[in-house]
Amino acid sequence: MEFLLLVKTKILSFIIRNINGDISDNTSKFYQINKIWRNIKLDQIPGDYIEFGIYKGKSLYHSIKSAKRIRIDKDRIFWGLDSFEGFPVENHNFYKNENFTSSYEKVLNQFSKFPEVKIIKGFFDEELQKEPLSDIKKVSFAFVDCDIYESSSDV
């Protein structure tokens, strides 16, 4: 089963890269998220999931579905953090704010049917110091999906 998933992932990655090289290769990322959740279950690691940089929420959604698929315990909270304003840095060669802003309201609506999901709007360096994030006791899976160094260094 794992082999077939890997083959499908590689084939889809190849197709996506050859259609448009600028398209992010999410299939490999999603495969790794599945693997991490399986290891968390196997090793019985307690704690919440926290994702830094959710953009439109695709990875967060995939992570929730992966955890549910393998019946991860239901008392975990899935935290999603993003500024929803693009990047805090203006000068970057590749990443432009107009390509990376997303709608906080749309993301909130997308996850409204998941009571275990908490979406936090703001910059990481500020939000990590405040409640409710400062009250997190244990994290089993931290996914840092930042596109620039300045943001990831705050995590």
Please describe what each predicted stretch is.
Residues 20-35:
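Short linear elements at protein peripheries
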Residues 3-24, 43-155:
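S-adenosylmethionine/decaboxylated-SAM
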Residues 31-45:
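Conserved alpha-helix/loop element of class I SAM-dependent methyltransferases that forms part
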